[in-house]
Amino acid sequence: MKLTKILLAVLLLALLVLPAILPAAMVNAAIQMLIAALFACAFNLLCGQGGMLSFGHAAYFGVGSFATLHAMSALNGQGLLPTPLLPLIGAMGGFICGLCAGWFATKRAGVYFSMITLALAELLHSLAPHLNTLFGGEAGISSMRAPAWGLDFGDATQVYYLTLGWVVLSIALLYAFTLTPMGRLTFALRENGHRLQFLGYNVHRLRVLVFALSAMFAGIAGGLQALNLESANYVLFDMRFSAEVVLNTYIGGVNVFLGPVLGAALMTFFGNAASDLTQSWLLYQGLLFVLVMMFMPSGLAGLVLCWSAQIRRRGWLAIIPAAFSALLGAGVLSLAVVFLIETLQRVFSQDYQALLMTDQAWPAISLFGREWLPGALLTWATPLLLGGAGLLVLKLARHQWLRLLDDEPVVNAAALRPRVEGEQP
């Protein structure tokens, strides 16, 4: 626990000094990472802690964004709600919409609940372009950040610190909620809702309240998005954003409180970096999600906790061989997959096909700093050899990891039993 607090303090300190060492473009990316982290953490209150998988949570993110923009235009950053407090309007919008939608959606559970949330979000996505007063039609609405508290909020650094403050406060409140009796009931709701009903609790009302609280914090994230971009349109209600928060949360780990924060931050950074390098970055995100679900169902945070437990038990030196083999194998295998996907993407692109029609020979493609001929055996043998080598190294890492687990000390249960007075050891 002490080490966890130290790591969190170091992380917070790093976030505070981050704008001083990053260029302006990267500060904007950092703001997006913070907003995505809060959105994922809000979603995990419903999914990971409450056991209710929603496929339409972007609706409450979007409602919070539009509500904040309307407040920005109406209040002009003055009065009781200056610019730094405008995300409260987003929270209110998300909470009210969450109460209304949650009342209907939580009438059912399981896959039926998920389909109802998806239907409600798609209904809003279809209606939004036609509701010009609320959502500005297809063009959306826009506003401007007004000065407040001696700050003009004209540069990305001030917006970053405002976003950081709201994200830290919101995540702290979400964690505090897990420690309350209501938070404990939320975990019990995930484990066995029927038992809660037999104990006399109103399960439907409990689900509605958890749904509304999750939507409220999603609305705060949407409000921060509105303050950052100063505009919004109906695309915020698109299914892609709802799917994105699901992927981020599960990749990070739904059973660890800060797991969604880790997953959202990493995947947002990956999206910003990879989208400038390749057209296939969404495919890589999907592959990563599939691999995590197949081989790391507890997510990246669960993997970190597992390795941390082994390090505390055995020390760094015992873990290094298996960790190095796993990282090396994953890196080589990833290189093979990227090589194959990028080669196929270039070969089947319209520009390459048009070039192929003008020339009977296969033109060379540029990849990893050199030219590769699609008709050459080496071009296709390279990813196969790299993939095979990566799989062999991963298999070695698996054997090393299993050997570590086999060396676990066996605890004698009789030795742990309290000894009766006069009993021989």
Where are these regions (language model features)?
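Transmembrane alpha-helices and adjacent helix-loop boundaries
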Residues: 1-425
